[in-house]
Amino acid sequence: MKHTRRILICATGLSPQIVTETIYALAVATKPRWIPDEVRLFTTLRGAESARLNLLSAAPGWFQRLRMEYGLPPIRFDEHCIEIICDGEGQPLDDLRCQSDNDAAADHITTRVRALASDPDNELHVSIAGGRKTMGYYLGYALSLYGRAQDRLSHVLVSPPFESHPQFFYPSRNERVIQTLGTNPQPLDCQRAEVQLAEIPFVRLRDDLPERFRTSGSFSATVHAANRALLEPHIVLDINRRHVLVDDEGITLGKTPFAVLLWLAKRAQLGKPAIDWARPAAADEFLAMAAQVMNPMSGSIERIESALEWRKSAAIKLAQYFEPHKARINKLFVQTLGERAAARYINRLILVRT
């Protein structure tokens, strides 16, 4: 499938060279070439100024120089593509100096990667090479949380002594001389530099997230939701309110689905095997459980008993009574917890043969 918009996502500090180095690696050095339609840059206030002056100004203007030197097509990258991370008060961050600054960076990066990955026409390439180490980590983790099959993660490798050199931005087509750093500077020809892309495999967790975290949620809350599948399942059923607490998430069920869940949870708690609910004995056992939790004056028991009684003569029809309730419970668990986390309950508590 061909995606209509290729977006390169980078994070930078005071060394914006990562942008031109990565574009060079993707669009010039790698075969087949991957040329972005757009660049999105996450950075601090100081980092944004450094990127603007070094990459986007008329001189030195390293971004356009790279594009013109190698005949690359137009790539959208201007001041509007540079996103400055803000603190909890909405003030631009000059640097990431403390825990709250890093939390703000994590939430900004997670929110933006989630938004860009929500468009099926976008193909994302995320570089973790620039910025603070925590920024690279957050970028990689955000892509793991929300990345799709078409998205990629990489690091760019630059040969010494060009690596981290403030005057090196990409290998030039022709001779361009810079000086080594230190007390005894030596000439270096940028034409001889080697820039390579190291693609990084990553685990895609998107489909395992609860539905609400696919459109919102802080970084820490989303990570917590993704990690639920590793925890021991814990379920609490409040009979009076027909309320279910799974992990730390609440679910409210109707009378009959709640009774079905309570029945199966009790069986699991007692270590009983899966029940064949196409057999009349299953209907009798469920009815006895429902009678314990439903108001006898409400008429609910009579309706359930009537619905089960005429189905007992046909095993398929009896199973069809339970199936919609089972499907409803499963769906709510998956919506609330995500598929992997919900499977801990579905496999243990709702293990029923049909």
Name each model-derived stretch.
Residues 1-124, 137-354:
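Long, low-complexity, Lys/Arg-enriched
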